[in-house]
């Protein structure tokens, strides 16, 4: 572990930490100068470095689970593809625009399951809305379930041009 004092605008107590990883490990991950995007995960006890998965790789490794694909559009433009694994409660996204105003999760590139659930709730009628039961009956949904409401309404809201397409994989 290499420990250095931080520079720039960091506090006088600020430090940076670097770890050197053996070449053989990097080669096994398939990381090279052109494909070097990785994810760092910390579970409270372990730091995990892994190659960032593509949507196809994620779909292949989660194919035994209940997997949904949501495509988030602004008008006719596809802005974000979301893969949501309802079995293990994980999410992977790919943004198709650089404008965070039009992406499903704004500037956040690595949403977790709670972020995904919050996003779904934002795209449908609030659970506390008066007349909720009548609304659900009118659209043919038995109980409050954001994903089921979105399947019926495409997550369309009066104040924007965003909408969702949901597919079971």
Where are these predicted regions, by residue range?
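Phosphate/dinucleotide-binding and metal-coordinating scaffold of catalytic cores
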Residues: 1-169
């Amino acid at each position: 572990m290499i420990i250095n004092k931080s520079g720039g605008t960091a506090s006088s107590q600020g430090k940076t930490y670097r770890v050197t990883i053996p070449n053989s490990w990097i080669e096994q991950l398939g990381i090279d100068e052109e494909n070097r995007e990785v994810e760092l995960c910390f579970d409270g006890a372990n730091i995990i470095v892994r190659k960032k998965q593509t949507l196809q790789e994620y779909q292949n490794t989660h194919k035994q689970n209940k997997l949904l694909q949501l495509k988030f559009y602004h008008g006719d433009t596809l802005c974000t593809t979301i893969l949501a694994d309802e079995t293990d409660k994980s999410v992977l996204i790919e943004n198709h625009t650089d404008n965070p105003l039009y992406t499903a999760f704004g500037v956040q590139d690595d949403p977790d399951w709670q972020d995904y659930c919050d996003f779904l709730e934002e795209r449908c009628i609030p659970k506390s809305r008066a007349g909720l039961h009548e609304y659900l009956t009118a659209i043919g949904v038995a109980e409050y379930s954001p994903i089921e409401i979105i399947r019926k309404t495409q997550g369309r809201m009066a104040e924007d041009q965003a909408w969702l397409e949901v597919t079971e994989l």
